[in-house]
Amino acid sequence: MSKEVHEERAPRTVEDVKEMLVKHSNGEIQRTIQNCITILQDDHVLADAIRLNLLSERTDIVKPVGWPRSGKTLNDTDMKYILRRMEKYGISSEKKIESAIRIVANENRYHPIRDYLNGLQWDGTERIPHVLHHFLGAAEDEYTCEAMKI
């Protein structure tokens, strides 16, 4: 998770999110990319669900969103469900919704391997001095240890 950009938010109901959206003077919700972003970030179904996977360079849905899914990567069927969800807010512009999804995903990018490795705790066992010996049968001496540090 991109800790620099991502903030924890409490997911809100449709009515709560509608109150947050920018409206015209007549009270009608404006159909803007920014309103789409607000919905994607705060709607209780979509909040924290859409992220850019830096390893695959694809947009992923990373939490249950209330419809059947077969994998993590955002697909056409997911888009149809998201469009249907956005209609609850009076927004149906597929281009604006797609733009908002790209922005939200980019702001919540992650790298699954880096995140996994950064989450590991070192067990305190020194391995560098022994790696060349273990994998290549090299002598365990100061030279091979220093060579591994390079």
Language model features by range: what are they?
Residues 2-123:
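Intein modules and their embedded homing endonuclease domains
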Residues 104-150:
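P-loop NTPase catalytic core of nucleic-acid-dependent motor ATPases
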